[in-house]
Regions:
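An amphipathic alpha-helix adjacent to DNA-recognition modules
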Residues: 37, 41-44, 48
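Structured surface interface patches that mediate subunit assembly and partner/cofactor docking
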Residues: 2-17, 21-32, 48-180
């Protein structure tokens, strides 16, 4: 496995714990207008798009009546399989930054997305909200220079002022517009 594959696997495991622990998929999430199900479907659909890009097939999405836990589990395994196959991991897909190899997109975008949505799903469903501290630090330092770009509609909302003495996780979440 590569460093990115390992990091992805660790973060996906954390998200998986929240998916497996979710009992109310209709719970309101911190993402405006989204339920817990919407958060899990968003992450799953992102994975499905990358898998389709690696395989040269048309992307599928999670159906409204589909078991989101099963869809997530399958999509996670499929993306992990892509990441451990050097030729598939090197396949180019479209990203917010332009064309990018899948492995690079996972490292730059998907890992951050999974990390943040782990918290969103945990908050929505009353589960453990603690995030991987090393991933929090890396994500925060990676996103700070992209502040203007990530404020575009549909990415992240306006920053929230963190409380005095906030830990790194709280600072990251507030930077991304989450109310902690």
């Amino acid at each position: 496995m590569t460093d990115i594959s390992d990091r992805f696997d660790n973060l996906a495991s954390d998200f998986d714990a929240r998916v497996q622990g979710t009992t109310d998929w209709s719970a309101t999430s911190p993402c405006e207008g989204w339920t817990a199900r919407d958060v899990a479907v968003h992450v799953t659909n992102n994975f499905l798009g990358l898998v389709a890009g690696a395989n040269g097939t048309e992307s599928t999405t999670v159906a409204a009546d589909e078991d989101v836990t099963a869809a997530w589990t399958d999509a996670r395994a499929a993306l992990q399989a892509v990441l451990v196959d050097p030729s598939k991991a090197a396949a180019t897909v479209q990203s917010p930054f332009g064309p990018m190899p899948i492995e690079q997109m996972v490292g730059r975008i998907i890992c951050a997305d999974v990390l943040i949505h782990t918290w969103d799903l945990a908050r929505a469903t009353g589960q453990d909200e603690s995030l991987n501290a090393e991933a929090v630090e890396g994500t925060y330092s990676g996103l700070k220079p992209m502040d203007a770009m990530i404020r575009q509609p549909g990415i992240f909302g306006p920053k929230v002022t963190p409380p005095a003495g906030a830990d790194a996780q709280t600072e990251l979440l507030c930077f991304l517009g989450r109310t902690v």
